[in-house]
Amino acid sequence: MSIQLLHKKLIKRKLTISVAESCTGGLLAHNFTKLANSSKYFQMGLTTYSNQAKIKILKVNKNIIKKFGAVSHECCKAMVQNLSKISKSKINVSITGIAGPGGGSKAVSYTHLTLPTKQPV
């Protein structure tokens, strides 16, 4: 689904969205907010690039990062769960991954995206 189509659906269905980003560095929030009338649905965009930002801003338990890594399903899930506590949006999205050029033990572009919602968009 394109960002333009999602934009139209969010407005039509009067849904709100917030995002917590890491590897994308705010690009997801930018893609939503560059469209006219995005204020009707876009509530919050947090860029938590460092582990410290994930811990301090999104309250990700440091043991999750230590055990599973910042680029893991567990970390991404904690990011979105804690985002939902502060944003109150109907839809919350988190993304974490390896942006490159080097990825350490994980491949460049290895990414986790979490979008829990009770209703289809």
Residue ranges and their predicted role:
Residues 112, 118-121:
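Single conserved hydrophobic/aromatic residue that forms the stacking wall/gate
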Residues 1-113:
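Short alpha-helical segments enriched in small residues
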